[in-house]
Amino acid sequence: VQENDLLISITADLGRTGIVTKEIAEHGAYINQHLTCIRLKQDKLNPLYVAYYMESDAGKEQFIAKNQSAVKAGLNFNAINSLKLMVPPLSLQNEFAAFVERVDQQKQTVQQSLEKLELMKKALMQEYFG
């Protein structure tokens, strides 16, 4: 795989996405039959924008509609190739992706703060009540 490749789960957890990071690409990685790799034209599509779109309700609905089996989830090449994508100008995609990254970073910071507070609370509870 290469940096910024879009990976999509095509079995089991249908439609989950991921972006190949520089670190992963530099160390070398391979995918198996449970993933598909899409190499986007980055002058037209921001990989992070596409990943978030695919995980949105609109994207998930497409995966559900194209699922080929009621027993075991799965998509083939034709199903993946027929997925529709709303494509705003690249500048808006980049703006959206940057905003979502900032929000995700802030969420992570808040989550870490909550975990620290919970540890402090437990320590105080232990100290006061044994």
Name what the model sees in each region.
Residues H27-T36, L45, Q68-N94:
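A short glycine-rich beta-alpha junction/loop motif
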Residues S82, M86-G130:
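Amphipathic alpha-helical coiled-coil/heptad-repeat segments
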Residues D13-L14, K41-K44, S56-D57:
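Short, charged/polar surface micro-motifs in flexible loops or helix N-caps
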Residues V1-E3:
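Residue-level recognition of short, solvent-exposed, well-ordered loop/turn junctions
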Residues K22, L40-K41:
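A structural micro-motif recognizing beta-strand termini
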Residues S9, T36, A51-E55, Q126:
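Generic alpha-helical structural context detector
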Residues L6-S9, D13-I31, L48, Y52, ...:
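Short, ligand-facing micro-motifs at secondary-structure edges
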